Amino acid sequence: MGIAGELVELGIKLVVLDVQSDFIHCSDNIFLKEKHHIYKPIPDDKLNIISCKESRNFLEKLGINGEIIYTPGHSHDSISIILDEGIAIVGDLDPIDNVLAYNENNILRNSWNKILSYNLKVVFYGHANERDVSFYALSNTFDMN
């Protein structure tokens, strides 16, 4: 726990999207109570905050062609990285094949519709195997109705 705080102490730049900034410290009190873990909160003055709109220019400076988009669903601060080569990295977002189980979750559906509006081939998840999404991407929508 708290690896981001430890990385910042080592001098590594932490980049945070503006849609995530309000959630940076929401779990600090919980983790600080756990005596068997060393937890280091992230100092606010070490946050490098960029907007989703700025993400393409930011990534381009790193040699990456793509952008970062806001995709709530797993949590209110979820983001996804969309690469121009047709790859999306969606982290903890619920896998596309499971979305039907959440038929009343318009936030999740809207996030998937936003992701699928790009010309995607493959999605990489944080906790699931990669998925070929070209079938979904052809329709440019994921309608749960």
What are these regions (language model features)?
Residues 57-62:
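Short amphipathic alpha-helix with an adjacent loop that forms part of the alpha/beta core around
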Residues 1-56:
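Active-site HxH/HxHxD metal-binding segment of metal-dependent hydrolases
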Residues 30-31, 65-144:
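Metallo-beta-lactamase
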